[in-house]
Amino acid sequence: DDDWVKATLLTSNGKDARKAKAEIRLKGDWADQLRDSHKLSFRIKVRNNDKIFGMSKFSIQAPKTRGNHNEPLFLDMMRMMDVIAPRYFFVDVRINDMKIGIMALEEHFNKILIESQGGREGPIIAIDEDWIWRQRHLNIIDGTSGLPYEYRDYPIKVFKAGKFSPGTIRTQHNMRAMSLLRDFMDGIVPANEVFDADKTSRWWIISNIWHAL
């Protein structure tokens, strides 16, 4: 997160053109996002409370890193079944007038994503996979395999947590969400006390359908 550089974004749909100030950095946890030096993966933040394609933060990556057309079709089905999912589509990219070609644009997790699909702003949490990627890199170096810890050992992260202020409603909601997920991972509370059973079942079914293809 310390590697951001300033940039200017120019977008066009063939009729109208837009310009916006932004910050950009390399992204990717795995070699497939950095292997092709011509199609590097980038995380992009639009500055000055502006938006591009209705988004304030998104990524671009080579389509093959996400299974080409599989990912947008998978996410489209999620939204059709009323499961919140990031917007994802293909764009023709140039960097400093150098033609990069078709890249996949993926919306980042924030309140704009939630509210654009009828949800209310609230905590967005996830299991932090940083340990997994670090261990996989070590496995490649050492010629080993597997992970030396269990699923319940992983830390939990909050997207855009902001400054920690104990008295604020936002901090209390973040802590409550993290506590519920941690209690589930530790086997203290059942899934139906943490997750929306109907939406979680739809997410599980769709994920298994597409990951089996």
Where are these regions (language model features)?
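Conserved ATP-binding subdomain of kinase catalytic cores across diverse folds
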Residues: 4-154
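Sec-exported extracytoplasmic/periplasmic mature domains
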Residues: 77-83, 186, 209-213
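ATP-dependent phospho-/nucleotidyl transfer catalytic cores
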Residues: 110-211
